[in-house]
């Protein structure tokens, strides 16, 4: 039985509809019981608006729980927030967002890391022989395939995919999942939202979040 008892939309009880969006991904009741109401509603509204894929989000959570259904994580390992004071004490795990912006960010990162070996070989060959090589349509196809397909798959297999955040904390050797977030979000606002929405559900949270100066 989920800790979340009833979710209403006007006079309609939509609890079953909301929770089914999450449980269909493989999230079990014991894990769902450690989801904040905030996170539950974030996943549901993202699903309804088609702005995020619940399966991608919940896959990373299942990986954190050691119970992946379809292979391991392809995103960066979990990391504790430590650059700014607002979210210190909390952890984040990346999940791969949907749409062009997420793909573009990963392609940009992979291009910076791996370069374009095929083009580099052409340039080195031209320099060595003194013969100018004019790029053909076939060259362009090979470069595009290397940059888009091969690099993307390599970054995935290296578990270097970046994306949005699943923000969580640990307590008594269990993970408690609090909120979604993005790199572009104001961490002070994320902190405020988590404190307001999650502290009454997980009362130990106040002892984990770093105290902010008055």
Explain the meaning of each model-derived region.
Residues 1-163, 175-176, 183-214:
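Basic, Lys/Arg-enriched alpha-helical interface segments
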Residues 170-178:
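Active-site beta-strand-loop-beta-strand hairpin of nuclease catalytic cores
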